[in-house]
Amino acid sequence: MKLLVYGAGVCGSLFSARLHEAGLDVSLLARGERLASLRRHGVQLADGDGTAVRRVPVPVVEHPAGGYDLTAVLVRTHQVDAVLESLAGLEGDVLFLHNWAAGAEPLGEAIGHERVLLGFPPALAAGTMDGDVVRPRATTFMTRRVPMPIGEPDGRTTQRLERIVREFRTAGINAKAEPRMDAWLKTHAAFEVPLGQEVHAAGGPVALADDPDAVRGMLHLVRQNLAAMPTSPVPRTFAALQTLPEGLLVALLRRFLRSPTAVNSGLSNASPATVAELGRLAEQMRAHAKVR
C-alpha cells in the first residue's frame, strides 16, 4: 500500500515516522519552511527531555498527486477546507484523522463520498514542536491500550477498512475498526470543546481546577452537547457524564485537571491554532444542533 501522510505538524510527523520505520511505503506532505527543513534533516525526533535528536528520513512531497492508495490527513479542524481543495479530482482513499464534528457528508461532497474514511490519531502521534524538532509525549500503559479508531461513514466493515487496519497494525499501531466512528468523533468534540475552552479561559488546567464553579459550568456544557447528539455517546463510558451526580463529577474533573496527564497534555497548549480549532469544532456542533 502506497501511503501519504498529509500534514507535517506534530501528529503527521510522528505518524509518518512510525510508518516509515516499520518499513511501509509512506511519504509526508509539507509546505514552505517545514518542507525545506524536512528535506534537509528528515523528521527530527527529540529523545525525551534531553538534547539528543534522532532523524528519520521520511520521503517528503509538496503535492498530493502521487497515485497514493491511501492519504491519511492529520491537520487541524479549521485547516480541512484547504486540504479538501487539493484532494478533489485525485484518486485513492482518504482517511481523515483529526477532530471533526460535522460528519462525513461535507468531506464526501468535496472529494467523493466513496473515498472517505473517518478516524482519530493514536496516542503515539501526540507531542510538541520545538522549532523543527518534534518532542513526542510520553505514553503510559493506559494510553498505549487505547486503540486508534477507524471507520466507514456508514458503519460497515468493508474489505478496505480491514486492509487499512491490518496495514497499521503491522507498523505497531493499535488500530481498530469502529462501526460508530461519526458518533465517536461527535462525542469526543462534545467533551473536548468545553474542556479546552474553559482551560484556556482559566489560564491552564490547574487554574481551572482551582475554580469549582467554572468546572461545574463546563460540565453543564458537556451535558448539553451530549444531550444534543442524535445517538448515544461513543464510547459508552461517556454516558456517565450524564448520569453520575454532579458533585462527584466535579470532584473527579478537578482531580484530573491537577494530574500530570492533564498538565502535560495538549490542554496546556493555548496557541492560536488550538483556539481556532476549538472554535471551528464549536461551530460544527452548533450547526448540528440546529439541524436536529
Residue spans of the language-model regions?
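NAD(P)+-binding Rossmann beta1-loop-alpha1 motif at the extreme N-terminus of oxidoreductases
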Residues: 1-51
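Hydrophobic anchor at the start of a short beta-strand
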Residues: 3, 25-27, 94, 116, ...
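N-terminal glycine-rich dinucleotide-binding loop that anchors FAD/FMN and/or NAD(P) in oxidoreductases
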Residues: 43-60, 192
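Rossmann-like NAD(P)(H) cofactor-binding subdomain of soluble oxidoreductases
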Residues: 52-136
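Soluble, non-transmembrane catalytic domains of enzymes that act on hydrophobic metabolites at membranes
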Residues: 60-61, 82, 157-168, 205, ...
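Rossmann-fold dinucleotide-binding core
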Residues: 100, 105-184
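Active-site-proximal catalytic alpha-helix in oxidoreductases
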Residues: 182-226
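NAD(P)-dependent Rossmann-like dehydrogenase/reductase catalytic/cofactor-binding core
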Residues: 223-292
